[in-house]
Amino acid sequence: MAKRIIYNENARRALEKGIDILAESVAVTLGPKGRNVVLEKKFGAPQIINDGVTIAKEIELEDHIENTGVALIRQAASKTNDAAGDGTTTATVLAHAMVKAGLRNVAAGANAITLKKGIDKASDFLVAEIKDKANPISDSNAIAQVGTISAGNDEEVGRMIADAMDKVGKEGVISLEEGKSMTTELEVTEGMRFDKGYISPYFATDTERMEAVLDEPYILLTDKKIGLVQDLVPVLEQIARTGKPLLIIAEDIEKEALATLVVNRLRGVLNVAAVKAPGFGDRRKAMLEDMAVLTNGQLITEDAGLKLENAKIEMLGTARRVTINKDTTTIVAEGNEVAVQARCEQIKKQMDETESTYDKEKLQERLAKLAGGVAVVKVGAATETEMKDKKLRLEDAINATKAAVEEGIVPGGGTTLAHLAPALEQWAASTLSGEELIGANIVAAALTAPLMRIAENAGVNGAVVAENVKAKSFNEGYNAANGDYVDMLAAGIVDPAKVTRSGLQNAASIAGMVLTTECIVADLPEKKEAAPAGGGMGGGDFDY
């Protein structure tokens, strides 16, 4: 494949073009008065969305080079989404502002490497400041406020997530399901989540979200390695007759057996997914036994004289729903409260008897997993399109509340970053010099970009609002929903510190990468040769 190579200013300008396109399409969703974006789908109804990272994932440009710019800034959004689960639009707007200002300086002759050093130092300073300014979160009222803001000012959602956290605890699992009614409901069921994902991505049932969702599956639990597919055949045949999905949780599955499962899954013979059992040694066995109690099944282990090849369908556990992604597996079970309760009592007894603090800690973890249960939010909406939008908002809100519990909250609405700009300028002026100082000032100038965009989306002059906010105390900011300046914490307009921090770090990282780009190598678009004119028989587009 022939390549085209672009150097220096041309390379950076082409990247900038792609970044401009993506940033603009994502930035329109920012703030309480942000608009929606409609995504055309090849199949099914278009999707109406207010979620930065989902929009970013959809954008593909015709020009390869510009598309590289899109991919770079998409990475800032995705990384922020992975770390904090929210704040993707803010990260995109920040990265865009830093790149714009940085490229102006590079074009004027500044050294890109030194600028990047300045940007990195400024980023480290700001991360420390955000940590310092964060307020720890304590009551469910504050949790509700975080959820409300993240779900796009939907108070009902915020309240619901706060209730869910009250019921399952801060470490508890909150999972989303598509409900059957018009209203969004919350229920708490038994269930557990553990930190192992699917063994092969081919098990994913939803390829867009890379998740495997199994409804009412049978669950096969074993503490041995599955090496030969022959061991599994008797069970697989019994399950294929029932037409229900199967989840296999085993110590490991060797290549041959795994390949057979994947082929069956892809051909649609059997809806199956396989996960490695969590933990090691005796602890792995204990956790598998916990799962057996939870799902009302048996652990197939040779210690109990049970062999895989003799397993009957009655020995398998069942669950209402299992959701598996690349990192975690969530089992939502129901109907065996008594057995689960008895198992919890047994674990508590072991905790009282053990001397080792390490064992106590691990037993406590098992108890929390088993007793905490799973809060299931059933998303209700009038149409499929609204349901998808609501589900994305809820997901953001759940992630944001978890991030807030971890690292505390800061004033929201772009306020924190805007207030940190003067502090950064002062610090940079006293500690940095030359082009490093210019790099730090690029970051300082970009810090007001999210606030300005929120104001502009609400139909006001962003620059004026930013200057007004800077002149006020740290907690005061601009409430775009009704257009006045308020104490953000008191008004409940808050962001998780983790979201603000991740967005800033990822934006600075991507900006540094773009500024230090000196050359791009991309595929040359292939020239399509004109088809010869069809003459008589055999010509045209027909097969004879």
Swiss-Prot record:
Keywords: ATP-binding, Chaperone, Cytoplasm, Isomerase, Nucleotide-binding. Signal peptide: none annotated. One of its GO terms (biological process) is protein refolding. The keyword ATP-binding applies. It is found in: Cytoplasm. SUPFAM superfamilies: GroEL apical domain-like, GroEL equatorial domain-like. Pfam families: Cpn60_TCP1 (PF00118). ATP binds at T29, L30, G31, P32, D86, G87, T88, T89, T90, G413, N479, A480, A481, D495. One of its GO terms (molecular function) is unfolded protein binding. GO terms for cellular component: cytoplasm. Its EC number is 5.6.1.7. Its main location: cytoplasm. It catalyses: ATP + H2O + a folded polypeptide = ADP + phosphate + an unfolded polypeptide. InterPro entries: Chaperonin_Cpn60_CS (IPR018370), Cpn60/GroEL (IPR001844), Cpn60/GroEL/TCP-1 (IPR002423), GroEL-like_apical_dom_sf (IPR027409), GROEL-like_equatorial_sf (IPR027413), TCP-1-like_intermed_sf (IPR027410). NCBIfam families: GroEL, PRK00013.1, PRK12849.1, PRK12850.1, PRK12851.1. Together with its co-chaperonin GroES, plays an essential role in assisting protein folding. The GroEL-GroES system forms a nano-cage that allows encapsulation of the non-native substrate proteins and provides a physical environment optimized to promote and accelerate protein folding. Forms a cylinder of 14 subunits composed of two heptameric rings stacked back-to-back. Interacts with the co-chaperonin GroES. Belongs to the chaperonin (HSP60) family. This is Chaperonin GroEL 2. The gene is groEL2.
